[in-house]
């Protein structure tokens, strides 16, 4: 599965739609091989301004990405879908806005050595030590017809 090609193909679509397309592409591949199984596909996309930030892949790129995000607000788009027998049954996407503390180079390097977030969207593991990088997290979750506001 070539994520870059999918991102290019849907480049004119809103970010929430793009992240669903990525999650669905992953689920569709697995569902085709396992037609009698329910398959959950998920993906995340980190966006700063209009730029999609790819996974760092290595230490040097991780420093660049976290230096760019330092002191700024960016968005994480999360998409999830359920497939069965090669068909999409359900999909959902949401957006969180995250404001990172202003980090020194030493703090960035120390964090990267601690969590090694090279394959993570935004180059941080929020569920681990990455949560400490943030000043503010803002998320609106739609639950049926109601909105739930979550602030961290």
Show which residues each predicted segment covers.
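Mobile beta-alpha loop/short-helix "lid" or hinge segments that flank ligand
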Residues: 1-3, 79-87, 119-132
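N-terminal polybasic phosphate/anion-binding patch
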Residues: 1-38, 51, 103-106
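Acidic/polar active-site rim loop that often engages polyanionic ligands
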Residues: 4-6, 45-47, 87-94, 135-138
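Active-site-adjacent loop/tail segments of enzyme domains
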Residues: 18, 44-74, 100-102
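Residue-level signal for inorganic ion chemistry
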Residues: 23, 43, 62, 80, ...
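Structural motif
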Residues: 37-38, 74-75, 79-81
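Anionic-ligand binding region
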Residues: 63-67, 78-96
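GST superfamily/GST-like fold recognition
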Residues: 72, 95-152
């Amino acid at each position: 599965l070539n994520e870059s090609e999918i991102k290019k193909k849907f480049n004119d679509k809103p970010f929430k739609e793009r992240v669903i397309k990525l999650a669905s592409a992953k689920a569709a591949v697995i569902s085709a091989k396992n037609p009698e199984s329910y398959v959950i596909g998920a993906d995340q996309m980190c966006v700063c301004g209009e730029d999609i930030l790819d996974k760092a892949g290595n230490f040097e790129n991780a420093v660049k990405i976290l230096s760019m995000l330092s002191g700024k607000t960016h968005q994480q788009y999360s998409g999830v879908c359920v497939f069965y027998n090669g068909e999409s049954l359900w999909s959902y996407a949401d957006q969180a806005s995250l404001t990172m503390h202003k980090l020194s180079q030493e703090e960035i390097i120390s964090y990267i050595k601690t969590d090694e977030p090279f394959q993570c969207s935004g180059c941080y593991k929020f569920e681990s030590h990455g949560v400490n990088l943030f000043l503010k997290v803002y998320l609106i979750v739609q639950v049926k017809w109601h909105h739930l506001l979550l602030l961290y």
